[in-house]
From Swiss-Prot:
<comment type="similarity">
    <text>Belongs to the thymidylate synthase family.</text>
</comment>
<feature type="binding site" description="in other chain">
    <location>
        <position position="205"/>
    </location>
    <ligand>
        <name>dUMP</name>
    </ligand>
</feature>
<keyword id="KW-0808">Transferase</keyword>
<protein>
    <recommendedName>
        <fullName>Thymidylate synthase 1/2</fullName>
        <ecNumber>2.1.1.45</ecNumber>
    </recommendedName>
</protein>
<feature type="binding site" description="in other chain">
    <location>
        <position position="29"/>
    </location>
    <ligand>
        <name>dUMP</name>
    </ligand>
</feature>
<keyword id="KW-0489">Methyltransferase</keyword>
<dbReference type="GO" id="GO:0006235">
    <property type="term" value="P:dTTP biosynthetic process"/>
</dbReference>
<feature type="binding site">
    <location>
        <position position="197"/>
    </location>
    <ligand>
        <name>(6R)-5,10-methylene-5,6,7,8-tetrahydrofolate</name>
    </ligand>
</feature>
<dbReference type="InterPro" id="IPR045097">
    <property type="entry name" value="Thymidate_synth/dCMP_Mease"/>
</dbReference>
<feature type="binding site" description="in other chain">
    <location>
        <begin position="235"/>
        <end position="237"/>
    </location>
    <ligand>
        <name>dUMP</name>
    </ligand>
</feature>
<feature type="active site" description="Nucleophile">
    <location>
        <position position="174"/>
    </location>
</feature>
<keyword id="KW-0545">Nucleotide biosynthesis</keyword>
<comment type="pathway">
    <text>Pyrimidine metabolism; dTTP biosynthesis.</text>
</comment>
<dbReference type="GO" id="GO:0006231">
    <property type="term" value="P:dTMP biosynthetic process"/>
</dbReference>
<dbReference type="InterPro" id="IPR023451">
    <property type="entry name" value="Thymidate_synth/dCMP_Mease_dom"/>
</dbReference>
<dbReference type="GO" id="GO:0032259">
    <property type="term" value="P:methylation"/>
</dbReference>
<dbReference type="InterPro" id="IPR000398">
    <property type="entry name" value="Thymidylate_synthase"/>
</dbReference>
Length: 294
């Protein structure tokens, strides 16, 4: 497929512009309201250590890394992230929010969300403090084993969408499944996202799944290839419209580089720490304030 000769970030900016100009106005579960389109695709090269951390406004890099590692450890207690200064799950883990969606659990217990499904699919969820060692299907371990043993497989798929558990989750998965592909010694990842908040969520998700691909490539001795992002409902919250109109006027800058530099033995994805990743050359435009709709 021919590459867009423009900066790859224009894919994101053009999609935002398209939604602002053509999106259907809808009310949503948060009560904020959105402009929405259905069906979109973006592709980002990860070759030569390229890391597609958007530059037209600052993306919370530490949050990207810490949340991904939180998922890879199978953790579900938002307070683990909050202690690291990452508060992206704080609203959804609040006791009041949990009660509002019919969940009676301790503050911060997010339920069987992404990490639980990735590492223990099919296990019975109890609490965020329970041990699930050896329980359920470890989809991440299975995917890594398949990449090593049968890289041509078309079945290297990980799903966070478990209908049995949806009612127990603080928030059902927005990014519901991903698939790995190995071609010519390069690992690529395609992710399907049923619901994409273009202001806050999607820039974060692009970086998160790119990082996941880079990490798994490191573990399997491959080179990172490409991240492909499929979106179902791609939307702009109405209270983000002015901020995004400002953002799409900014010219993209060069994407930074990301290097995996482990500070100790890292044989499994859950062994990695924030300090094992080195971000070089990130020079974004200033942050733009946007509210989170919970």
């Amino acid at each position: 497929m021919p590459q867009d000769p423009r900066h790859p970030e224009h894919q994101y900016l053009d999609l935002v512009k398209h939604i602002l100009e053509n999106g259907a106005r809808r009310m949503d579960r948060t009560g904020t309201g959105t402009l929405s389109v259905f069906g979109a695709t973006m592709r980002f090269s990860l070759e030569d250590n390229t890391f597609p951390l958007l530059t037209t406004r600052r993306v919370f890099y530490r949050g990207v890394v810490e949340e991904l590692l939180f998922f890879l450890r199978g953790e579900t207690d938002s307070k683990v992230l909050e202690k690291k200064g990452v508060r992206i799950w704080e609203k959804n883990g609040a006791k009041q929010f949990l009660q509002s969606v019919g969940i009676d659990r301790e503050e911060g217990d997010l339920g069987p969300i992404y990490g639980f499904q990735w590492r223990h699919f099919g296990a019975r969820y109890e609490t965020s403090a329970s041990s699930y060692e050896g329980k359920g299907v470890d989809q991440i371990a299975s995917a890594i084993a398949a990449i090593r043993a049968n890289p041509a497989s078309r079945r290297i798929v990980v799903s966070a969408w478990n209908p049995t558990d949806l009612g127990s989750m603080a928030l059902p998965p927005c990014h519901v499944l991903f698939q790995f592909n190995v071609t010519d010694g390069k690992l690529s990842c395609a992710m399907y996202q049923r619901s994409g908040d273009m202001g806050l969520g999607v820039p974060f998700n692009i970086a998160s799944y790119s990082l996941l691909t880079i990490l798994v490539a490191h573990l399997t001795g491959l080179q990172p290839g490409e991240f492909v992002h499929f979106l179902g409902d791609a939307h702009v919250y109405l209270d983000h419209v002015d901020s995004l109109r400002q953002q799409i006027q900014r010219p993209p800058r060069a994407f930074p580089k990301l290097f995996v530099s482990p500070k100790g033995p890292r044989t499994e994805p859950e062994h990695f720490q924030y300090e094992d990743f080195e971000l070089v050359g990130y020079d974004p435009h200033p942050a733009i304030k946007m509210n989170m709709s919970a």
